[in-house]
Regions:
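Carbohydrate transferase catalytic cores enriched for Leloir-type hexosyltransferases
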Residues: 1-339
């Protein structure tokens, strides 16, 4: 459809976390002409999945200042997509804002101060100004209604997904895998404590993701840092099990990617994880270390259960595809623009 779209590209700078993946996978699939413009305050070096988009860089030392003062001036389009929860408060064109979670409000001590301030200061005004709101899960939509009074009719569920890149491999690995930014709310302290309590010989623990902050990983635990998609897929495919003990999530992409790659999954009941993983993974309550330990021991010693979860996870992941999410976002942007 003919629709001029400009996208706040801050989640794509410098490296992609979950919100960056969401932004890129949907932006690259938007069915609009001309191709969308991704604007940012610094160069976007990883253009995987967004090769067909157009780019605009207006260098600024701070992403929030750029969003609030530069983006409104350059937003010459029919509609803006704010994929990171906020939009410029002086924006003069229609906008759609995507909500991933409210952890900076519910768990401020588990975020950097600049993250808390940038989100909490602008979220209420952003939701008031947005024509439409996308939420990655029903849980986040309900929180937006309850805390900010967003009319439910304005909210569309646009979930995260996977594509055919994440597929089963040959397996063969003997390690427990965690993938995600190393930050307090991801429950890494719970995972490390439980892993340390496992009887010897225990499977190695591999932690993969950006360094983040306020998380100390002891010696003896493998840490890969950020890895590219090819390496990430291989890690998923070869894991004996994937464990995601997050204390709070809006959606949680890594368990879905792990399921698509055939890794048996243990995760917590938070955000959208029960929506897509119930019955296809072992789920425990956030912060329940005894239940997490029991689940790891159960899965480690039961090959038939691992095989069952592998097959169920692969099938379940097929219900969550980026193509469908991009279609929903295209429709939402069109509605917001009045096209």
């Amino acid at each position: 459809m003919n629709l001029r779209v400009i996208i706040d590209g801050r989640p794509l700078v410098p490296a992609r976390s979950g919100i960056g993946v969401h932004t890129a996978e949907i932006a690259g699939r938007l069915d609009v002409t001309p191709s969308p413009v991704i604007a940012s305050h610094a160069e976007i070096t990883n253009r995987q999945a967004i090769e067909h988009c157009r780019f605009r860089v207006d260098h600024a030392p701070n992403g929030i200042l750029w969003q609030q003062f530069v983006l409104p001036r350059i937003a010459d389009a029919d509609v803006l997509w704010g994929p990171h929860g906020t939009i410029p408060i002086t924006l003069r064109i229609p906008a759609v804002v995507t909500l991933h979670d409210f952890s900076s409000i519910t768990m401020p001590g588990r975020h950097l101060l600049k993250t808390v301030l940038s989100f909490n200061v602008f979220i209420s005004e952003s939701l008031d100004r947005a024509r439409r709101v996308a939420a990655v899960s029903k849980a986040i939509a309900e929180e937006a209604v309850r805390w900010f009074g967003v009319p439910r009719r304005l909210i569309e569920i646009v979930p995260n997904g996977v594509d055919d890149f994440f597929r089963p491999g040959d397996g063969g690995g003997d390690y427990i895998l965690f993938v995600g930014t190393l930050e307090p709310r991801k429950g890494i302290a719970d995972l490390v404590a439980v892993w340390n309590s496992l009887p010897e010989p225990r499977l190695p623990l591999m932690i993969c993701g950006d360094p983040g902050w306020r998380v100390r990983v002891p010696s003896g635990v493998g840490v890969t840092g950020w890895v590219d998609r090819e390496r990430l897929r291989t890690l998923y495919q070869r894991a004996r099990m994937f464990v995601y003990p997050s204390r709070y999530e809006g959606f949680g992409i890594p368990p879905l990617e792990a399921m698509a790659c055939g890794a048996p999954v243990i995760a917590t009941r938070t955000g959208a994880i029960p929506d897509y993983a119930e019955g296809a993974a072992l789920l425990v309550d956030p912060g329940d270390r005894e239940a997490l330990r029991a689940a790891i021991l159960r899965l480690q010693g039961n090959e038939s259960l691992r095989s069952e979860l592998r097959e169920k996870g692969i099938e379940r992941s097929k219900q969550y595809r980026w193509d469908r999410s991009a279609q929903l976002m295209t429709e939402l942007l069109s509605e917001a623009a009045g096209a």
